A protein has these predicted regions:
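Acidic donor-binding loop at a coil-to-helix junction in glycosyltransferase catalytic cores
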Residues: 174-183
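Short beta-strand-to-loop element that shapes/binds the nucleotide-sugar donor at the catalytic cleft/hinge
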Residues: 119-132
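Short beta-strand-to-loop acidic/aromatic patch adjacent to the donor-nucleotide binding site
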Residues: 88-97
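Acidic donor-binding/catalytic loop of UDP-sugar-dependent glycosyltransferases
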Residues: 98-111
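Short, acidic, metal-binding catalytic loop of nucleotide-sugar glycosyltransferases
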Residues: 27-36
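N-proximal low-complexity "stem/linker" segments adjacent to membrane-targeting elements
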Residues: 1-27
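Glycine-rich, basic loop-to-helix element that forms the pyrophosphate-binding segment
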Residues: 67-83
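A conserved acidic beta->alpha catalytic loop
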Residues: 42-52, 68
Length: 229
């Protein structure tokens, strides 16, 4: 598929209890060199609906609010299905608490359009945010941290992959702890996948992070990562 014709870009962003991070994520999407056509935000969990945090941005946001906790895989599958129904051709899996450089979407589409169904990058920056200080590591590699073999929030894929992923996420036999494990173990092996060397993302570790809050509490030297150098 040509990168300039018949493209409809859909982004799904799960969010929980962090309206300030979600607003930042949507602002980053609006700053992309290739803006998405639809941003499907899924607020999952207890608490008040915070759609107000992006209401003034005039962004193409579809807001879904699930007032009670649901299975982890449905947190991703629900907005993914909406984007499929909206006839999207290119899909982006984004987390509300990561940083996306302005060329992220454009870079991913360029890589998918050379013949891949799925792309992910193991190269990224890492920001450890601890008040009142922070650590920034511009060169890190996600080799074994995530099941996908890269930074999960850097994933992008085509419609055939999206349909297969939706089916896999809805399979009760694939009851892994995290949705990206389902993707890595069951969906990726059936498609043409690219492990990109492009760095268009920064992974954010903060006190509320489910997967990396321990970095905030530790005096880390990033033994979990390999340097690009």
């Amino acid at each position: 598929m040509s990168s300039t014709q018949n493209i409809r870009i859909g982004v799904f962003v799960p969010t929980f209890n962090r309206p300030e991070l979600l607003r930042s994520c949507v602002l980053q999407l609006l700053a992309q060199t290739r803006r998405p056509d639809i941003i499907c935000v899924h607020q999952n969990g207890e608490g008040d609906n915070y759609a107000w945090c992006v209401a003034d941005l005039h962004a193409p946001v579809v807001w879904m609010h699930t007032p009670a906790r649901i299975p982890q895989n449905d947190w991703y599958r629900t907005p993914l299905n909406h984007l499929i129904q909206e006839d999207c051709t290119h899909f982006f899996w984004m987390d509300h608490d990561d940083i996306y450089l302005a060329n992220h979407i454009e870079t991913c589409i360029g890589e998918l359009d050379i013949g891949y169904d799925f792309r992910i990058s193991k190269h990224c920056g890492v920001l450890i945010s601890r008040s009142p200080a922070f650590q920034y590591h511009p060169h890190a590699r996600f080799d074994d941290i995530h099941a996908t073999g890269g930074m999960s929030a850097s994933m992008a894929f085509t419609l055939p992959f999206a349909r297969a992923l939706s089916t896999d996420l809805g399979n009760p036999e694939f009851n892994h702890v995290f949705a990206d494990e389902v993707l890595a173990r069951h969906t990726m092996p059936r498609f043409r996948c690219l492990h990109s060397t492009q760095k268009t993302t920064v992974y954010l570790s903060h006190a509320s992070s489910l997967s990396s809050a321990h970095w905030v509490r530790e005096d880390t030297t990033f033994h979990e990562f390999r340097s690009d150098a």
